[in-house]
Amino acid sequence: MRKIGIIGGTFDPPHYGHLLIANEVYHALNLEEVWFLPNQIPPHKHGRNITSVESRLQMLELATEEEEHFSICLEELSRKGPSYTYDTMLQLTKKHPDVQFHFIIGGDMVEYLPKWYNIEALLDLVTFVGVARPGYTLHTPYPITTVEIPEFAVSSSLLRERYKEKKTCKYLLPEKVQVYIERNGLYES
């Protein structure tokens, strides 16, 4: 059975924190690949102004293109409406019955697991991998695999705010992503 990690998110924008998490879990669990799963409309962010799918996908491609063990999975982008992890993983497990999926989540999402849509059935489809993020504990009633990662306190919301305030984002996200953001005027106030 193949072992593949899945890291979902809006990736608005993708940054070195996403890449660090994916790479650390890849090595810690001896995965074959890590698939980045950009969300269409995540239920917990419904109503927030999210950058276009096309721009987020382009930035994600730029961020991951140099790592041969990173791929982009378009499963959620092909659907309309809110993206529920259960629905996505049900489709992926049907398409790839030879794969054991490891769904990678940060500490904030570990604490939120009891509120996830159809969590009990989702646990039959994936192994959850919780990574330590600053300020969060990994306490949950559900079985998760824990991976320790070096502390790197950057988030997409922090980057959007820094761009809005015209502060530098150098060394926080890949240079190609930074150039794309600046050329396309993303995150300006």
UniProtKB/Swiss-Prot annotation:
Its EC number is 2.7.7.18. GO terms for biological process: NAD biosynthetic process. GO terms for molecular function: ATP binding; nicotinate-nucleotide adenylyltransferase activity. It catalyses: nicotinate beta-D-ribonucleotide + ATP + H(+) = deamido-NAD(+) + diphosphate. Pathway: Cofactor biosynthesis; NAD(+) biosynthesis; deamido-NAD(+) from nicotinate D-ribonucleotide: step 1/1. InterPro entries: Cyt_trans-like, NadD/NMNAT, Rossmann-like_a/b/a_fold. Pfam families: CTP_transf_like. Keywords: ATP-binding, NAD, Nucleotide-binding, Nucleotidyltransferase, Pyridine nucleotide biosynthesis, Transferase. Gene3D superfamilies: HUPs. Catalyzes the reversible adenylation of nicotinate mononucleotide (NaMN) to nicotinic acid adenine dinucleotide (NaAD). Belongs to the NadD family. This is Probable nicotinate-nucleotide adenylyltransferase. It comes from Bacillus cereus (strain AH187).
